[in-house]
């Protein structure tokens, strides 16, 4: 796992989707098996074993069995929403075409959907890459999403993101409507987790338009 890399198109980093923590881990584990410089074939199956999952995410092997089974059981229904505000288009597609849990072998096999493959074939695209181990100890799917959104801008060390866009990306438009709740339950726990468990140190602040909070500003760097 030490050298396993997650590489995604920036469009995928900023897409709207909601996965559980372990569904997210399952997808990321499969992505590390790709070589983004080579075409991904639709029929390719990717294998994630309970032993590998246990080692990567530091969970007991028996827990890894049930975790993989549960995460794989819902993965086929999970979708992604893409936004192109300039072209005024929206897309929606599944993560996977197929997913199987092999009870006797304690493993999952999955194949990515035809529609997501262009976001994983990284030739001629802007993309974000990071080591899987950096997010392996994050405790929520939201923390993983924040890490990806920040590391996408690691060269500048700054990122502004509107609350509207953040809610769209995290698919929480109708949740945590008060900023106090958004900060308490999503932002603060995610950033604190990133600061304690990854290679980033992050500070953040609000941006206002008059009295209204409209955006968030993040300043970050790789920890020394």
Residue ranges and their predicted role:
Residues 1-224:
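Charged, alpha-helix-forming regions
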């Amino acid at each position: 796992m030490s050298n396993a890399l997650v590489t995604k198109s920036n469009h995928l980093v900023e897409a709207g989707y909601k996965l559980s923590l372990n569904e997210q881990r399952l997808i990321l584990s499969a992505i590390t098996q790709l070589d983004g410089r080579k075409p991904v074939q639709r029929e390719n199956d990717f294998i994630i074993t309970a032993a590998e999952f246990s080692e990567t995410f530091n969970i007991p092997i028996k827990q890894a069995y049930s975790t993989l089974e549960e995460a794989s059981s819902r993965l086929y229904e999970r979708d992604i929403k893409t936004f192109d505000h300039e072209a005024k288009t929206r897309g929606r597609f599944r993560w996977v075409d197929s997913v199987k849990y092999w009870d006797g072998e304690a493993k999952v096999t999955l194949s990515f959907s035809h529609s997501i493959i262009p976001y994983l074939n990284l030739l001629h695209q802007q993309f974000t890459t990071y080591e899987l181990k950096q997010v392996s100890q994050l405790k929520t799917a939201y923390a993983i999403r924040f890490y990806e959104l920040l590391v996408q801008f690691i060269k500048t060390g700054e990122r502004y993101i509107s609350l509207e866009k953040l809610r769209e990306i995290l698919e929480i438009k109708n949740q945590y409507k008060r900023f106090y709740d958004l900060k308490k339950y999503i932002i603060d726990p995610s950033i604190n987790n990133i600061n304690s468990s990854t290679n980033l140190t992050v500070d953040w602040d609000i941006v206002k338009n008059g009295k209204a909070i409209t955006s968030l500003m993040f300043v970050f760097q790789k920890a020394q």
